[in-house]
Swiss-Prot record:
GO molecular function, one term: DNA-binding transcription factor activity
Subunit and partners: Homodimer.
Binding positions (NAD(+)): G91, C92, G93, N94, I95, G96
Family membership noted in the UniProt record: Belongs to the transcriptional regulatory Rex family.
Any one GO biological process: response to redox state
UniProt keyword Transcription regulation, yes or no: yes
Cell compartments where the protein resides: Cytoplasm
Name assigned to this protein: Redox-sensing transcriptional repressor Rex
Taxonomic superkingdom: Bacteria
Length: 212
């Protein structure tokens, strides 16, 4: 199956949603699903579904629908969900602590396997209820050198985000999910995704106001 590596970012962001839908369809015993069924489940139009799928070659035949189990396995493969992906978290403030308690592995094969904060943080040297060890930020290199971790979740204050991101890159991290509302200047081969809760809430309020 041929995959177009130049897919739009909007399409890429929907991949995990498609995967989730096909897993749900499979659990419900649905063997075939039309583009309309998929679109309705996601709240988008069927043309968007067909356009998204066109980037991945022949995923289904017109008039026959999409094979649910086949597509579930396809998206699991491109999202690397056949094997466990270990990630690290840096920043054990309010957001960081909430994420430490979030059970990623209950839904997907991702797990936070270690966390870091300032060496002076009370959590350093301890293990969370879910068995995640918390280390001092000065030991990042020591703990990553023999690990398979290439992804980090960054939940530090915006004033520290760039400095910490630089440390992560030097330690071998290839991808960062940043909750800090600042743009990070990093090498081009480092992938960064931003989660700005304030911006998302403001966007929601804007659309709500437009409906009044």
């Amino acid at each position: 199956m041929i995959m177009d590596k130049s897919i739009p970012k909007a399409t890429a962001k929907r991949l995990s949603l498609y995967y989730r839908i096909f897993k749900r369809f499979n659990t419900d015993g649905i063997e075939k699903a039309s583009s309309k069924q998929i679109a309705d489940a996601l709240g988008i139009d069927s043309a968007t579904v067909r356009r998204d799928f066109s980037y991945f070659g022949e995923l289904g035949r017109r008039g026959f629908g999409y094979d649910v189990k086949k597509l579930m396995n396809f998206f699991a493969e491109i999202l690397n969900d056949h094997s466990t992906t270990n990630v690290m978290l840096v920043g054990c403030g309010n957001i960081g602590r909430a994420l430490l308690h979030y059970r990623f592995h209950d839904r997907n094969k991702m797990q936070i396997s270690m966390a870091f904060d300032l060496d002076s943080n009370d959590l350093v040297g301890k293990t969370t209820e879910d068995g995640i060890p918390v280390y001092g930020i000065s030991t990042i290199n020591d703990h990553l050198i023999d690990s398979d971790i290439e992804t980090a979740i960054l939940t530090v204050p915006s004033t520290e985000a760039q400095e910490v991101a630089d440390i992560l890159v030097k330690a071998g991290i290839k991808g960062i999910l940043s909750f800090s509302p600042v743009h990070l200047t990093l090498p081009k081969d480092i992938i960064v995704q931003y989660v700005d809760l304030t911006s998302e809430l403001q966007t929601l309020l804007y659309f709500m106001n437009q409906q009044r």
